[in-house]
Amino acid sequence: MIKVYLSLLLFVFLFVGCKSENVQGIIIGDTLLAHQSFGENQKLKELIIKSLKKDEVAILKLKDFPNGGAAGSYELGYIITQIIYKIGEDEFYKTLSGFSSEEIKGFEGYINAGLEYGDNDYDGIMDNKRMKQEFPKLYDLFEIDTNK
């Protein structure tokens, strides 16, 4: 009987502890990962997969995904920039171009954080890049939007 309980307990710990930290090549940072429940991690995983398929609703939901603020926000920005690199700036630009000004709010900050503090070239060093040089179309989109 004790073996059954121990086996069940082990199964529960393994199941709950199996959060995804890499989803189709998109890295989820340690801080964001640590502050997620298993269910939240599965929702984030689903949003990442759908965003890579250029699902507009998923991209919007990803921007609004609860991240706990501070370092979690930077890590969500890093997820977004990794997605942009994977699907291409042109595709991400097309998606955002279809959104209202209200829906676009927030993306600029996340992208800036992801470029500056993320490791998008996976060399173990923060990139410290700027949107104007890295994603000029998106930069122009945000400039136009703020001038409305």
PLM features per residue range, with description:
Residues 1-4:
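Positively charged n-region of N-terminal signal peptides that target proteins for export
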Residues 43-51, 57-75, 79-83:
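Alpha-helical segments in soluble extracytoplasmic regions
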